[in-house]
Amino acid sequence: MSAFGSQSMAATLRRVLMRSAANAMRDADRSAWHYGPGFNPAKAASQHAALAELVAASGAEIEWIEDKADGLSDSVFTHDPSLMTSRGALILSMGKPLRAREPSLHEETYTRLGIPILGRVEAPGQVEGGDCVWVDTRTLAIGRGVRSNQDGIQQVSNLLTPLGISVYGFDLPLWQGEEACLHLMSVISPLADDLALVYSPLLPAPFYQMLKARGIRLVEGDAGEFASSNGLSLNVLPTSPLKVIAVAGFPKTKAAMEAAGCMVEVFEADALCIACEGGPTCLTRPILRQ
């Protein structure tokens, strides 16, 4: 079994990169990090540990970035600073200035794990992992918005095109402003290779058309739950096709996934995901899916 490679959003999760919230978030300034009033460092750490237990119970091996009080509170959201391919890791470039040091944490960890670095997105280019969606193993969609720009998308394309991978950029709306980040993955969560949970009013129209043309079935997330959660109701992590982990408290969206054939596990995440604007997908960087 290969030790790395993840060009699918929903194939069985075998190996994943995470970072504990125990120290990273302990002294976080809620205002500086744009966290909501429900943020509580100790409770967030406990909820993160509960997520890690679910991930491990699925059979995935968790690789941990060193947990220390380095002031990088958002570094628990490991999905964003890197992207994994069958040829190695892409080290990305963050659109949020407070997160600028995080890609180096990923590069150091991959080096320790013996995973090759395929390339890097360099400033002024910006791409965050939350804007990257594998439509299939040869097609990568990237949302162009406040966190990922055309320069960064072009750099990713330059790195992946020689591998036979097509990269497409899709414009995202501003939605609630620059600080309240809207990633492409804020409006789509693949549940299987041919099934995705979406909030279609915010989907880029050409991306929606691409999904439909490729026969991907779309499950609509509940609009009220999407609004009340600032999109976190839609952020679900597939541990294998049709088996997902979601934030508790959104029964209509959970029922929609179950009606489409999914098994849904939930965890309490009010102090972590809701308060800090990042769900179970954001808290994990798949290293190996197969």
Task: Please annotate each region the language model reported.
Residues 1-290:
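The feature marks the mature, well-folded catalytic cores of soluble enzymes
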